[in-house]
Swiss-Prot record:
GO terms for molecular function: rRNA binding; structural constituent of ribosome. Belongs to the universal ribosomal protein uS4 family. The gene is rps4. Pfam families: S4. PANTHER family: 30S 40S RIBOSOMAL PROTEIN, 40S RIBOSOMAL PROTEIN S9. GO terms for biological process: ribosomal small subunit biogenesis; translation. The lineage of its organism: Archaea, Thermoproteota, Thermoprotei, Thermoproteales, Thermoproteaceae. This is Small ribosomal subunit protein uS4.
Length: 181
């Protein structure tokens, strides 16, 4: 009996009810390929996060008006800081329309690829895991890190990374100025 061997999974009820549904399998496979996910567990974690956000939004919509105003403002502010919504003044019903791609677009792996720091989504994952990527000077080694909106501009190569040194050396050899990214 005693303590459990491992903590509880974070994607409680994140697994689909019917694992062998061909439409679901194809959509999951497309998302895994498009966002460079390592396994379906990463997709289920994103779905679980989105499910909890939508659940909170439904609770707020069903709450009385005196409670609803402040709770709605807090939820929208949190989602805006996370980067999942583009404007705080959107109706709460549009929060219910969010899909899993909104969460997957905020992953560090996706943002590194979208910024052009990697040639492919898989290379972006490798750069992160090997410690070549930092956010505001702090190395982040988790490709699944959800980057808040205020830290998005701080994504860059780690200053001590060999990739930065190689690029600076290459620029100097070509006669250009050494520019630190």
């Amino acid at each position: 009996m005693g303590d459990p061997k491992r903590p509880k999974k974070k994607y409680v009820e994140g697994k689909p009810k019917r694992l062998w549904n061909s439409d679901l399998l194809m959509s999951e496979l497309r998302l895994i390929g498009e966002y460079g996910l390592r396994n379906k567990k990463e997709l289920w974690l994103a779905r679980a996060l989105l499910r909890s956000i939508k659940h909170r939004a439904r609770e707020i919509l069903s709450a009385p008006m005196e409670i609803r105003g402040e709770a709605e403002k807090r939820l929208k502010d949190r989602l805006f800081r996370m980067g999942l919504i583009s404007d705080i003044n959107i109706p709460l019903d549009s929060v219910l329309a969010l899909d899993v791609t909104a969460v997957l677009e905020r992953r560090l792996q996706t943002l590194v690829y979208r910024k052009g720091m990697a040639r492919s989504i898989h290379e972006a994952r490798q750069l992160i895991v090997h410690g070549h990527i930092s956010i505001n000077g702090v190395r982040v080694r988790s490709p699944g890190y959800l980057v808040p909106r205020n830290l998005e501009d701080g994504i860059g190569f780690a200053p001590t990374s060999r990739i930065v040194k190689a690029k600076v050396t290459q620029q100097v050899n070509q006669g250009g100025q050494a520019v630190n990214q």
